[in-house]
A protein has these predicted regions:
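Helix-enriched interaction subdomains in cytosolic or periplasmic regions
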Residues: 16-39
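Soluble catalytic domains of membrane acyltransferases
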Residues: 27-31, 43-216, 232-233, 240, ...
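A broadly conserved sequence feature marking short terminus-proximal activation segments
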Residues: 191-259, 389-402, 407
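Cys/His-rich short segments
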Residues: 238-292
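Structural motif
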Residues: 265, 346-348, 380
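Short, surface-exposed beta-strand/loop "edge" segments at domain boundaries and coil↔beta transitions
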Residues: 277, 334-336, 357-361, 388-402
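Long, charge-rich boundary regions
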Residues: 277-358
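Acidic, Ser/Thr- and proline-rich intrinsically disordered linker/docking segments
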Residues: 366-427
């Protein structure tokens, strides 16, 4: 999938009119049927099946909140099939509306800015379930998994569940990540995909629980490990490109400690600095071919990288300072490519400068619990996004080495550290 991009001077981009808020629309039966029909070929190719658990508790015309894990673009096609003919609105990233806002609204999409405060979102969701009598599809992780494990959930989720006052349904997929992991550059593998659609909480059950209790329940439901699932279920991925781009996730060599010198190509991940070589097996495990393996499991390696980043933050040595190509979004007409600059990230948060000295934007560490970061974003490149309600800045690192995953890890760990500091200060 691509996105409309226009070259434009920075001042001209910022001078564009802002997008006016528009209430959600209930998707028509025609669009629901069309989306289902368009989804059918890919689902047939994956021999898709869905198990339904407790769904007899949900009335045929009763709106609900569907919470789904987010693995790849196939997720939406799965939802179109398993929820049909039930009408549902989809909470999606605002840049998905660029160049096609009318179509997205007709499909029932509700735009939101990832990892940015959005007070209008809950109002739109309430409008959908109360006025439109439509269900809501929400990906609470708000981003694709890098390493095949769950990403953090927002603390506001429990409050949102209670505010909506509708049944909560969980849609969990298996095989979608193994078929199309984000790091692998949109190369689909031959993997069967399945899902479970499960009635989780009635409105009455949700009302009896505190927001914190609901958060704990959902955190448990969204704990998963796709690589472990692949190994335990003997799911074979024998494509010769299965390790392509794995360096985007495993960017730091555990043997020599060098960052940005790993390279995933074919079935192997190598370190160009020390020469260590790993093979990603057909079952998704790691085998070291010329040394004693430090890790045999991709998520364990990624967790080690997270621990290393946290240690850097605690010691005050963490720093990202990278040249970037910069795009901005101020409305749904287009993404504006505005020039070059530098993105700095340290204990004080983000600072983006550039466009001949005209751009100087900062974002504090406490702004969000995570970071909008993506690989091969709309086929433009690996991307880090910061911003506010007015403007979103899409930064594409231009230097050597993979910095996107580390930056997201750092943003998440820095948020935790700042929250802990504030809690300690307040007693």
């Amino acid at each position: 999938m691509k996105i409309k991009v226009v070259d434009m001077p920075y001042e001209q981009a910022l001078a564009q009119p802002r997008e006016k808020h528009t209430p959600p629309r209930r998707p028509s039966m025609l669009f629901r049927a069309l989306l289902r029909a368009l989804s059918a070929p890919d689902l047939r190719a994956t021999h898709f099946r869905c198990d339904r658990v407790g769904m007899e508790r949900l009335g045929p015309d009763e709106p609900c909140l569907v919470l789904m894990n987010h693995s790849c673009f196939l997720d939406l096609k799965i939802t179109a099939a398993v929820l049909y003919p039930r009408p549902f609105n989809i909470v999606c990233t605002s840049d998905g509306f660029v160049g096609k806002a009318g179509l997205m609204r007709a499909l029932g999409c509700i735009p939101t800015r990832k990892f940015q405060p959005d007070t209008a979102l809950v109002r739109d969701m309430l409008y959908a379930v109360k006025k439109l009598k439509s269900s809501i599809l929400l990906y609470p992780e708000a981003s694709y998994s890098f390493d095949g494990t769950a990403t953090p959930l927002p603390e506001s989720l429990g409050k949102c569940v209670k505010a909506l006052g509708v049944p909560i349904v969980l849609l969990r997929t298996c095989g979608a990540f193994a078929r199309d992991p984000l790091y692998n550059g949109l190369q689909n593998r031959r993997v069967n995909v399945s899902a479970e659609l499960r009635y989780l909480l009635s409105p009455e059950e949700a009302a009896e629980k505190s927001a914190d209790e609901i958060n704990a329940l959902l955190a448990d439901e969204f704990s998963f490990d796709n690589f472990r699932w692949q190994q335990e279920n003997g799911v074979v991925v024998n494509e010769p490109f299965r390790a392509d781009g794995l360096n985007r996730v495993l960017y730091k060599c555990p043997h020599c400690g060098t960052e940005g010198e790993t390279e995933g190509r074919g079935t192997e991940l190598i370190c160009r600095d020390c020469g260590v070589r790993y093979r990603l097996t057909e079952l998704g495990a790691l085998e070291c071919e010329n040394a004693e393996a430090k890790f045999t499991h991709v998520p364990d390696w990624y967790a080690w990288e997270r621990a290393c980043v946290r240690e850097e933050l605690e010691q005050g040595s963490y720093l990202l300072d990278a040249p970037v190509s910069i795009c901005v979004m101020v409305n749904f007409r287009q993404i504006c490519r505005v020039g070059e600059g530098r993105l700095r990230h340290d204990a004080n948060g983000f600072r983006l400068t550039g466009c001949g000295g005209k751009l100087d934007f900062t974002q504090k560490p406490e702004t969000s619990y995570s970071l909008y970061a993506d690989y091969f974003w709309y086929e433009l490149g690996d991307m880090i996004c910061i911003g506010d309600r007015d403007v979103l800045y899409y930064c594409f690192p231009q230097g050597n080495g993979d910095v996107v995953a580390k930056t997201r890890l750092a943003a998440e760990e820095l948020y935790k550290l700042k929250r802990a500091e504030r809690a300690a200060k307040n007693g």
